[in-house]
Each structure stands twice: as C-alpha cells, then as structure tokens.
Amino acid sequence: MSNAAQKRAARKARAAWTSCLDTHAQQEEWTQIFSTIDPIDFMLPEERKRLDELPNEFMVYRGYQGYRRVGLCWALSLEAANISANLDQTLPRGKVVACRVTKADVYALVLNNGLQIIILPKTFRSKYKSIYQAVR
C-alpha cells in the first residue's frame, strides 16, 4: 500500500473510531486495525503535539460499568473517567481504575468531544492487567 493510501486508511479508521458509540464490543477488531495503521497518521496534528507534551510517565484512568474493566479507551483525567463510568443509566454506578503508563505504552491520543482519550493496544492490557488500582 502506498504512503498516500496508508494515510487515507488511517483517516477512515479515525472517522469510524470517533463516530463509534461502543468501541468496547469490537476491541479485537480495533486492535487488528490499529496494528496496520501508523498512529502518526491516525492522530491529528494537535493530538500528536499534546501527546509529545506529556511527560514520559503519567497516570491514565478508565471509567467502566459492568464487565468492561479492561479496554482500549483511557482518560487523562479522573473527571473524564468518572463520566465514562456512568454513561449507561440503566446499569449500576460504574467504577474507575487508574494506571501509571509510559508514552511507549500509548498507541494514540484522541481529542474526542473535548475529552482527552488515550487508546492503548492489547499489548498494554496484558502488560498491566495485574497492577490496576481502584481509585473509587
């Protein structure tokens, strides 16, 4: 695939990701897609800049309900994770887990609806599964 075609594929994947209401249900498919796309092409210039500005090691938070504790989407702020933890009003109140990560663990940073979301690939999940810390 040519460089231009790779960039187009990344932009289409990004459009699908940012419009998807439930990325959790297709984690395996998204992981497969991300393995074929350069994150530089997936992120917008402002997102790449924001990711570059982060320290090498930082905290991320995941808000979840029910069985969705392990996932691809993490927030940079506890407030954003709290929102994610309670999106579905038909489910019991959710929880938030926190994890310290390095930039090398991050696939991409996406500014979606004003929330900074970190997308972490499947390798991250297996690497950090045993050190999740409940924060509430």
Task: Report the location of each language-model feature.
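Conserved NAD+-utilizing ADP-ribose enzyme module
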Residues: 1-58, 63-72, 76-136
